[in-house]
Swiss-Prot record:
This is 2,3-bisphosphoglycerate-dependent phosphoglycerate mutase. NCBIfam families: pgm_1, PRK14115.1. Pathway: Carbohydrate degradation; glycolysis; pyruvate from D-glyceraldehyde 3-phosphate: step 3/5. It comes from the Bacteria. It comes from Borreliella burgdorferi (strain ATCC 35210 / DSM 4680 / CIP 102532 / B31).
Length: 248
C-alpha cells in the first residue's frame, strides 16, 4: 500500500478578500500561514515524513509547502515545481470579487464558471498584463500551451498527464510524496482518483491548509482517503469554500 498526501495552500490574501485568483501570484494571508504551520504540526504529530514534494509555480502553494516541510524538519528534500499543478486559470475573472460578480451576472452563472466541468469564463486577451505570456516564470513554456482561460476539463487535461508521468512514478518507487497545490488542480486529481462524475465534482469542496491522505493499492487505485484533523473544523472549512461566489 502507498500513501499520498495532498494539501491545498493555506488561505491567500485574495481568498480572504473573496477575489478570483487563478494564476495571479498572491501571498498567503496571516491565517494562511497559520494553516500551513498547523498542517505541518499535524503531519508531524501523525508521524508523516516525505522523500519528495511537488508544487505549482505559484507562491501561495510554494510557501505552504515550505512551511510544512520546515515544521517537519525536512526543508532539505527535493521539490519539483510545475505550471501543470497551477490553479485553474480564471481568465478575465481574475482579480474580480466573487460576490460582486455574482450580483452582476447571477449566482447560477458564477457557480457554472467556478465549478462546472467544461464551461470556461471569459478569456484574457494576450495584450492583458494578467495573461501568463507576460509573466517571466512561464517564458520557457510554449506560448500555445499557456491558457487565457480554463474550465476544469482543461485543468484535468494538464494535471493528470503530470500525475501519470511524474508523480505516480515516484509513488511506485516507494517514495513518500506530498503535493501542495490548489483547489482546482487538486479537484482534478480527486476526480481522477475517485472516478467522480462531472456532477459530483461540481459539489467537491477542498479546504485550505488541511492535509488530504490517499491510501493507494499496488496499481495506485484508491483504497480510501481522509483528511487529517478535527472533523467539525474540516466540515466548517468545506462549507466556507462552498459559500464563495454567493451573494452576501
Amino acid at each position: 500500500m502507498y500513501k499520498l498526501v495532498l494539501v491545498r495552500h493555506g488561505e491567500s490574501e485574495w481568498n480572504k478578500e473573496n477575489l478570483f485568483t487563478g494564476w495571479t501570484d498572491v501571498k498567503l494571508s496571516d491565517k494562511g500561514i497559520d494553516e500551513a504551520v498547523e498542517a505541518g504540526l499535524l503531519l508531524k504529530q501523525e508521524g508523516y515524513s516525505f522523500d519528495i514534494a511537488f508544487s505549482s509555480l505559484l507562491s501561495r502553494a510554494n510557501d505552504t509547502l515550505n512551511i510544512i516541510l520546515r515544521e517537519l524538519g525536512q526543508s532539505y528534500i527535493s521539490v519539483k515545481k510545475t505550471w501543470r499543478l497551477n490553479e485553474r486559470h480564471y481568465g478575465a475573472l481574475q482579480g474580480l470579487n466573487k460576490s460582486e460578480t455574482a450580483a452582476k451576472y447571477g449566482e447560477d452563472k458564477v457557480l457554472i464558471w467556478r465549478r462546472s466541468y467544461d464551461v470556461p469564463p471569459m478569456s484574457l486577451d494576450e495584450s492583458d498584463d494578467r495573461h501568463p505570456i507576460k509573466d517571466p516564470r512561464y517564458k520557457h513554456i510554449p506560448k500555445r500551451e499557456l491558457p487565457s482561460t480554463e474550465c476544469l476539463k482543461d485543468t484535468v487535461a494538464r494535471v493528470i498527464p503530470y500525475w501519470t508521468d511524474e508523480i505516480a512514478k515516484e509513488v511506485l518507487e516507494g517514495k513518500k510524496v506530498i503535493v501542495a497545490a490548489h483547489g482546482n488542480s487538486l479537484r482534478a486529481l480527486v476526480k481522477y482518483f475517485d472516478n467522480l462524475s462531472e456532477e459530483d465534482v461540481l459539489k467537491l469542496n477542498i479546504p485550505t491548509g488541511i492535509p488530504l491522505v490517499y491510501e493507494l493499492d499496488k496499481d495506485l487505485n484508491p483504497i480510501k482517503h481522509y483528511y487529517l484533523g478535527d472533523e467539525s473544523k474540516i466540515k466548517k472549512a468545506m462549507e466556507s469554500v462552498a459559500s464563495q461566489g454567493k451573494l452576501k
